[in-house]
Amino acid sequence: MTGKDDVFLEEARLGPRSQVLVDCEEVPNIPRLVRRFREYLLTDLAHAVMLTETDILTGARGPKLLAGLLEIFDADGDGFPWLAQSGSFLVQVEHRLGQRIGEDIAGLLRAGPSRNDQSAAAERLFLRDLLLSDSIYIGSNISFETD
């Protein structure tokens, strides 16, 4: 029997993930998540700010949630403890927050957006930044010759 700290939300609800799924789907997806770490955390931070400013999170809960997210953000993607068996970034961050600030507050981050919402927003931010950096690079390497 595992302790409560060892069980992810999905595992408690659906049972353990198939090792084939973990090896063939989740492990290869980790580099993609690492590349988009900043964007995923920015969507979480923006959502936490909204929850706090609209008083959905009252008292010390909002500031505590924001502090936990900022701590994870500062760890950067390479320092984050990626766990392939947990699956999505959303579940991984919620698990890490639960360890840091308590499950009761960590679970409040999911009041509203779905995984699809978060993934779409993070992907748009990632691609926007990629296009902007490529445009700046191209623009700085254009030279105009006059005859």
How would you describe each model-predicted region?
Residues 1-147:
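A helix-coil-helix interface module used to build multimeric assemblies
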